Amino acid sequence: MKILVCLKQVPHKDARLELTSDGSWIQDANIKFEINDYDNYALEEALRIKDKDAASEVVVLSIGPDRVQQSLRTALGMGADRAIQIWDDGLAHADSLAIAKSIAAVARAEKCDLVLLGLMADDTNFALTGPMLAELLDVPHATGITSAKFEGGQVEVERELEGGALEVVKLPLPCLLTVQTGMNEVRYASLKGIMQAKKKPLDKKSLADVGLSAGAVAAKVKIEKIFSPPKGGGAEILSGSKDEVANKFVGKVKELGLL
């Protein structure tokens, strides 16, 4: 089985974030980055499949400037076989559809049996790339999975729904799955794995290399502004005995016209 795992590099959880001058995104020049948490679980699931079937190949892919190579090397150190980086100036302001189109071009060329992604990205929480990618590849998909069992050319997955409910879905291969956090226990790269990762192939591709133009991945969605929610007026503490506090509370409610 050939498995493509899509990894997004996001700002480190401890990074001190500042907005750009136009307020459209964060300044990313001098902050630390890490693999998106959801994607770590997707990678771990792929590696567990490979643990059971040594003939399986795990290919990791990330879209971004050269800093993403660090995350790709980490994935190789954990056990992935190959890495692919896609970057082009035309992707500098890419939206979810542009990212999905870029991944789809690679997935078609690789002829993958399974595509795995995290449910969403820690920095945007859109959860759009997976379903868009499945549509572009014309393959069945399931989102937010918490378990997967592969047998006889198909996979049975459990999906996490609202309210704690679980849904069981069967899909034929090839297919695409987006993974929920907590699906498994993510491994660390061993020292041996880190050393081996230096010798594993990491292929950097441009849009032209994957058969796309800048126009084909032009963003349809633009983030206009990011801002912190306005601060509230604070809270008023009512003091006194129980009866006094109750009377004051009723008075305040009447004063606000709520009673």
Can you say where each PLM-predicted feature lies in the sequence?
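N-terminal glycine-rich FAD/FM-binding segment characteristic of electron-transfer flavoproteins
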Residues: M1-L259
